[in-house]
A protein has these predicted regions:
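Active-site-facing alpha/beta catalytic cores
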Residues: 1-162
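Catalytic-face loop-and-helix region of soluble metabolic enzyme cores
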Residues: 143-191
């Protein structure tokens, strides 16, 4: 239900840049950033006034009053993820509707485990957390299982080594994935 209300707000005009002054942002007004935010509001209003003078308004361009948003989370609790999985009636493909993007955690990415098995069956983009215990050949095999067609954009490797380990582990992982010719997106979790 939270996602549905966000969808309604994002498409129903709440995100309209023309209403930036009306958004309930009391927390900003009480913060040290209030002056900067007010300046930003004013710049947006000036830009919109200029665009309107040029004939570009939200009457003709929905990008001025709607936004797209994407959600993600760790696919940790499999009974929940399974209950949120639906079949696309036009393609027959399965999608986890609990989020647009789900990831497998560092402690649950066993090749023969339930989390990999679940994610193997859905069409969502999938992230794989990679920490100091990750072995490049293991991560490569998981990528191949989750993305057998090696589609671009399907797999994101989320490095989570910590500042003290990143130089030791990340280059090996990058070389291992590159050697296998796998299409992945690289992301960093600074935790």
């Amino acid at each position: 239900s939270t996602l549905n209300i966000l969808r309604a707000f994002s498409k129903g005009g709440f995100a309209d840049l023309n209403k930036v002054h009306l958004w309930n942002l009391d927390y900003i007004k009480k913060s040290p950033q209030a002056k900067k935010f007010k300046e930003l509001e004013d710049k947006i209003a000036d830009a919109l006034a200029f665009m309107e003078a040029c004939g570009i308004t939200s009457d003709f361009n929905n990008r001025l009053y709607t936004v797209n948003f994407w959600t993600s989370h760790e696919a940790l609790h499999l009974p929940f993820e399974e209950s949120m999985t639906r079949v696309d009636s036009t393609t027959g493909e399965y999608h986890d509707t609990s989020a647009h993007f789900v990831w497998i955690g560092d402690r649950t990415r066993q090749l023969d485990g339930g989390h990999v098995e679940f994610c193997k069956g859905i069409e969502n983009p999938i992230g794989i957390k990679c920490g100091p215990t990750s072995k490049p050949d293991e991560i490569a095999k998981i990528c191949e299982v989750l993305n057998p067609k090696n589609e671009k954009g399907k797999i994101t490797l989320i490095s989570r080594f910590g500042h003290q380990n990143v130089e030791k582990f990340l280059p090996k992982l990058i070389r291992g994935i590159k050697k296998e010719g796998l299409n992945v997106i690289w992301s960093c979790d600074p935790m």
